[in-house]
Amino acid sequence: MKEVVVVDCIRTPMGRSKGGIFRNVRAETLSAHLMSKLIERNPNLDPNEIEDIIWGCVQQTKEQGFNIARNAQLLTDIPRSVAAVTVNRLCGSSMQALHDATSGIMSGRGDVYMIGGVEHMGHVPMDFNIDFHPGIAKTAARASGSMGMTAELLGRQNGISREMQDAFGARSHQKAHAAAVEGRWNEIVATEGHDADGILKLIDADETIRPDSTTESMSGLRPVFDPVNGTVTAGTSSALSDGASAMLIMSADKAKALGLTPRAKIRAMAVAGCDAAIMGFGPVPATQKALKRAGMTMADIELAEFNEAFAAQALSCIKQLGWLDTYEDKVNLNGGAIALGHPLGCSGSRISTTLINLMEANDKSIGLATMCIGLGQGIATVFERV
């Protein structure tokens, strides 16, 4: 099978969903901007050679409906002969886009793909028009439809204390802020948005980071999902944000022929299911499957990105994979979704992009990106620098 490499990976800044920088910018516009930027940044690539654009998005309605991948593409100069499709694996959608494109290249269905994802949670809320089948209560726990309650359950199962969660939440903001101050968010491409006064500007910094977050300030917040006995607060949950991310991937042979330098190759991929009531456990079996396919163990992973849906969830998975005592220098070195937010369709390729940048910055060879998925799934990708 063909070797698949990542040639480029970028993202927009993350905007707050409530009256944030992208309050007047549509999801298709954010997506089209990144599609165009990937072409602009890689002039050796003839856009006609792109086989497909695969875009992740969860709430496929309103401005995000009717195949947002194609709608966004039509806002660009990418030839109309290039195809585009939108995929949905809830939180793992854009990582699923990466997996689908990788499989396409490996099986000979084209050499060049553009993948990514978007979610404008300000314009299309996460729970907009959700209508669960009433009969699901017979086959799945009530908590299955409440992501916060699944985090509460998983945290209790794994002994993740309120103090551990508060420290992890503060860590996310502190590390993300340090990365911003030190200019380490080199994956961000300036994107048009509006400041607090409504002035249109090019925005090149995340709006969601709270630099003043501390373990002490986190400890003062009340539990939001289980007010009586709970430990999960707004501060230890992923922020609601708007954003997009994108990657250009191709076969190693095509990259060489075009004179493009690969940044990483895909070593292994996996998805897995778990009980929907502890949906946040999904990264554990997905990671185990991916590592087995790569012929590796967690000892081989030098850096990892765990999507921070909730501190209780991320810490539970880190513990189950044997890293709870050693994760500080390996996991989410620039913070994560607690600080940046979790725009659902965007996050899979966002954490993959962040991981690749961190692997380069820290001269590491093997990295893992993994995330939980609502209703009980997980997805994981193992990357190797080349």
Curated annotation (Swiss-Prot):
- PROSITE patterns, from UniProt? THIOLASE_1, THIOLASE_2, THIOLASE_3
In which organism is this protein found?
Pseudoalteromonas atlantica (strain T6c / ATCC BAA-1087)
Q: What is its EC number?
A: 2.3.1.16
Q: How does it assemble?
A: Heterotetramer of two alpha chains (FadB) and two beta chains (FadA).
Q: Which HAMAP family match?
A: FadA
State the family named in the UniProt similarity comment for this chain: Belongs to the thiolase-like superfamily. Thiolase family.
Which InterPro entries does the entry link to? FadA, Thiolase, Thiolase-like, Thiolase-like_sf_Thiolase, Thiolase_acyl_enz_int_AS, Thiolase_AS, Thiolase_C, Thiolase_CS
User: What does the UniProt keyword field contain?
Assistant: Acyltransferase, Cytoplasm, Fatty acid metabolism, Lipid degradation, Lipid metabolism, Transferase
Cellular component terms (Gene Ontology)? cytoplasm
Q: Which PANTHER family match?
A: 3-KETOACYL-COA THIOLASE FADA, 3-KETOACYL-COA THIOLASE, PEROXISOMAL
Descriptive protein name: 3-ketoacyl-CoA thiolase
> In which domain of life is the source organism classified?
Bacteria
Task: Give the reactions, separated by semicolons, that this protein catalyses.
Answer: an acyl-CoA + acetyl-CoA = a 3-oxoacyl-CoA + CoA
Primary role: Catalyzes the final step of fatty acid oxidation in which acetyl-CoA is released and the CoA ester of a fatty acid two carbons shorter is formed.
Q: Which SUPFAM superfamilies match?
A: Thiolase-like
Pathway stated in the Swiss-Prot or TrEMBL entry: Lipid metabolism; fatty acid beta-oxidation
Q: What terms describe the molecular function in GO for this protein? A: acetyl-CoA C-acyltransferase activity
Active site positions? C91, H342, C372
